[in-house]
Each structure stands twice: as C-alpha cells, then as structure tokens.
Amino acid sequence: MSIKVWPKSERPREKLLQYGAENLSDAELIAVLLGKGVKGKNAVSVAHELLNELGCLRGVVTATKDEFAKVTGIGPCKYAQFQAGFEIFKRNLEIKLQREDVFNNVDDTKRYLQAKLRDCQREKFALLMLDSQHQLIAFRTMFNGTINSAAVYPRELIKQVMIDNAAAIILVHNHPSGVAEPSHADIRLTTEIKSAMASIDVPVLDHFVVGDKETISFAQRGLLT
C-alpha cells in the first residue's frame, strides 16, 4: 500500500516534522532517507527489507555497495545518499571536537572514534593530534594492519607529531575481533610510545581501543601510569 494513502500521523516524513526524528523507528528513519519505495513496495517495506538483510541500522549505514544492492530495486544512488548522511554525522562530531576540550569530553571522543574505526575490517592505529588547549588539530591514521594486528613504529609517530606541531596526543586503535579489551601488547606499546614522546615533551593523554560494542579508555582504566 502506498504511504500516500496512510493517515498523515503515520507517514514517516510527517511524523518526523511533527514529533522530531528521535521519535521515529529505525525503519521509518530509513524510509525518510529512501524518499520512495520500489515497484510493489513502499519505502517502509523496503526499509524493513534493508534492516532484515543487513541486521540493524548500523549495518545499513556501514554496508558495502554490493551488500546494499541485495535488496531489489535499491541502486547506487540510494547507497550514495546513505553514505553521505553517515559522513555528515562523522564530520559533525569532528567539528564538535575541534571546538571543545577533547580530554574533558571522553564520551564525545569515544563516539567520534567509534564512527571512524568500529567497522574497519583491518586493524588501524591512529593519533589524535592536539594543540596546547587540547583541541583537535587532526586525526592521523598512522599504520594499517591485518585482521588482528598492526605494526607500530614510535619513530614514525614522532615524525608526524612534529610535522603537525602537536602539543599533546591521544592514541587509538581498533580491534576488528570486536572485543575492546586491551591486550598486554597494547599496554606495552603504550608505555613505549609514552617514553618516545617524552623525549620531545609531548604527553600521551589517553589510548582508546575501539571494539564492536564498547570503546575503552586507558586513562579511565588507570593504564597510563
């Protein structure tokens, strides 16, 4: 049944305008982004198919083009719309970090890093370069690894820190396994990097490990001593 014949109070777009996006279900939000359905299916029906195929809202926005296309009638244009929306979300978080004191906004930092790294299929090691006010200068992916490791070289980190003229840094890497618990190797590496950065008087404020369901802060765990 076409959404046009639904009562106005039940149409996703009208509900959003009247009650706000936070009051829509995942399927209704997807339907608004889709705009319209495909032959024989309205936008809400297609949205449910996407959720069933890709598992959840996160699966929809992080799916590959081929995965997205498994739902009949959904082409590259719709995929591009969802990717653009997800990128806007990530950039908005980055802008927020650039305006605020990163170290005093651990939850915002976690959300930003989750958006950056949670769905990467290979391990990545990155630095948040901070100025003297602990505001974000840049996010730098320093090393790309395999599904369970990434080789990290402190000398290369020092070189990039000096190029960016960072006053402090935050370390971050993801665990593609989905488990964010820091390993003994993670703790040893953090100690090595702290020692290397001390040689140029740049403090390491935190080290985040991004997993599937959580992001762990070394500082909150007392692991930076």
Swiss-Prot record:
PROSITE patterns, sorted: MPN (PS50249), UPF0758 (PS01302)
A GO term for molecular function: metallopeptidase activity
Residues at which Zn(2+) binds: H173, H175, D186
Domain MPN residue range list: 102-224
Motif (JAMM motif): 173-186
UniProt entry keywords in alphabetical sequence: Hydrolase, Metal-binding, Metalloprotease, Protease, Zinc
Keyword Zinc-finger included in the entry's annotation: no
GO biological process: proteolysis
Database matches in Pfam families: RadC (PF04002), UPF0758_N (PF20582)
Presence of the UniProt keyword Glycoprotein in the record: no
Family that this chain belongs to: Belongs to the UPF0758 family.
PANTHER family hit by this protein: DNA REPAIR PROTEIN RADC (PTHR30471), UPF0758 PROTEIN YEES-RELATED (PTHR30471:SF3)
Protein name in UniProt: UPF0758 protein MADE_1000235
UniProt organism field: Alteromonas mediterranea (strain DSM 17117 / CIP 110805 / LMG 28347 / Deep ecotype)
